[in-house]
Amino acid sequence: MQEVTFFFDDSGVFHKNERSGYFVYAGYVFTNRSTLDAAKRKYINANKALKKALGRNDELKAAGLSAKHKRSLFNAVKEYDSVSVTVNLSHIYDHILSKKHSICRYKDYALKRCIKGKMKALIESGVISKTEDITLSIFVDEQLTATNGYYNLRDSIIEELQFGISNFDYGIRHQNLFDSNVYVKLLYCDSKTNYMIQASDILANRIWASYITKNRNLRSIDNHIALTLP
């Protein structure tokens, strides 16, 4: 059984008054356990060293760190595969931005597109096979949970990858990626206990900050696949 593991966090507010004008999902992707464990060790070591230097024992969130300290955490795991999807909020219809359910649907759609883009790249590069069964484990910060959103998002990812159905692009049918069974585990986690979600918070904030500071170099990341919507 093939396995791919994703970790995600977000940055920005999905609202027309968001000061950067953008909403970002970003995170890390692993195709084997040994690489994931190595990344986790590196991030934990960098995290502990920074906590010691700062005299802190709470969770280190990007919003409460200086650019220098965020950079040190980012550098600890920058060699690993990562992904992001950035939503240009100025191009999102008001009727979507004005309804909580519509916002949740669009955010799920964005996350699904991001995952599909990476899976397509993994197939094209020969890292995974489209004809073998596969399990996706997707770890997301629990604060991103939408009411009744778990099964909608999980089932939607399976449909998109295995059957080629898109529920948001009305009237458009996307080709399926896999000619095999796709299993999805969607897990909402407390970021306090998940270091790769903490690393994803740093990454998402870096991409979001690139729009605030108008510094495109912050988005120049090796081994990274970036998607922009709509």
Q: Where in the sequence are the language-model features?
A:
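Phosphate-ester processing/binding pockets and catalytic centers
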Residues: M1-P230
